[in-house]
Amino acid sequence: MAKTRSPSTPPAPERVAAFQTGISAETRAAAFLMAKGYRILARRFKTPYGEIDIVAQRRKLIAFVEVKARARLDDAAYALTPRQQQRIIAAAEAWLVANPDHATYELRFDAMLVAPKRLPQHLPAAFDASP
């Protein structure tokens, strides 16, 4: 007797809402960066080590940007944990391997804080890759 595959269960509504909020926040953050003169090189760059929300370039600078969306900007500021920072650094290294022509650029790890009805807040050099 052949097994029948049960239909996959849809994701929980709160997970769908969180995903949509994240996509919206990343779109707002990317638009804000472009208005500041950055060129978006990648969005949601996935690696086995982690994901980079936005990779942006301005002149000879590459910014790896983590976007944090919360109800309040203060809450967003505290949402970037040391473990996440390490995953972003590892993902940035993978991005540089895939994009070696940018290896000589200045590298920076930024954060973009996004809250409803507020302009995104860009935090250049929010953390560094030093051990």
UniProtKB/Swiss-Prot annotation:
Molecular-function annotations in GO: nucleic acid binding
Ranges annotated as spanning the membrane: none
InterPro entries found in the cross-reference section: Restrct_endonuc-II-like, tRNA_endonuc-like_dom_sf, UPF0102_YraN-like
Pfam families: UPF0102
Signal peptide: none
PANTHER family: UPF0102 PROTEIN YRAN
Family affiliation: Belongs to the UPF0102 family.
Protein name per UniProt: UPF0102 protein RPD_0400
